[in-house]
Amino acid sequence: MPITNTIRNAKKTFNIFSKTTLLHKFLYFLAFLICIILMTNYGKTQVEGFEKKKKTNEFTMNTEMADIYDDFYVSIYDDLVFYKHKNDFEIGNLIKYSNMIEEKSNVLDIGSGVGHHVSSLKAHGFNATGIDISPSMINKSKETYPELNFQLADALNGSTFQQNSFTHITCFYFTLYYMKDKHRFFENCMQWLNPGGYLAVHLVNRDKFDPIIPAGNPFGIISPQKYAKKRITTTTVKFDNYEYKSKFDLKNEVNTKEEPNAFMVETFKNIKNGDVKKNEHQLYMSTQPEILNIAKSVGFIVISKIDMVECQYDNQYIYILQKPT
């Protein structure tokens, strides 16, 4: 009997459908087609989402800056390394030691990352521009601070800005060490600065600074390096979906004018599917005197050396350099 009723209902539905106008038939067909498309897409989405949860154990190794600082890395960048007290310390001392004047100072932040330094400078009343060679970093900066100025640019390209464009230039958080040609960097900064302008650069004692990233310091304001018999060079952090590990390696015998001598290798392991992503940061870590001699050779004058120990960055410094008037 159920089959008979089904056939009877189907015939009834067909008779009703056959008596409708051509327009109604078209609309019924269109609605049916849309339902089919939606059901197909829904199934596809569910399959793709499910497949991402399967164990794939893929391995990726990145050494290029644009590949390292991709959308994923940028999304967790603050969780790994951001420390507001350090940023405030850097900007505060820049203001203190470099004669900054609200609205008249025009600052370039090289290696602006996700934009926090530019935001802080703007909050203090200064004009500021951030540049970075990572498209993902620039996109994130513009998304977070849409009212501020960020550009995808390389500090080693002298044509990026006109001569005498800025009163101040900053280069914080190891940015300078990613550059092989430091002479060109200082030449470009000299060209872009106004006469009497200031350049603030972050330099470290490469043999003693703490390579543990902020996220991996379980003691917060106390560095475990002070109590370790041997320098700690590894960091391990567990996030919700990823395990993070990093290891710093320094080779002092390498000529940094030719090749990198320091490496920070980061490993991200996806807890759910076993995927592994590795980043190898290649750094040209010349000594502080070597770098300062390059700066002096293009005409810079060293004005101040600021110890960052106050913000828990032992053996790290901000140097304030000045272009002659």
Residue ranges of predicted features:
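A short glycine-rich, Lys/Arg-flanked "PGG" loop and its adjoining helix->strand segment in the class I
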Residues: 183-195
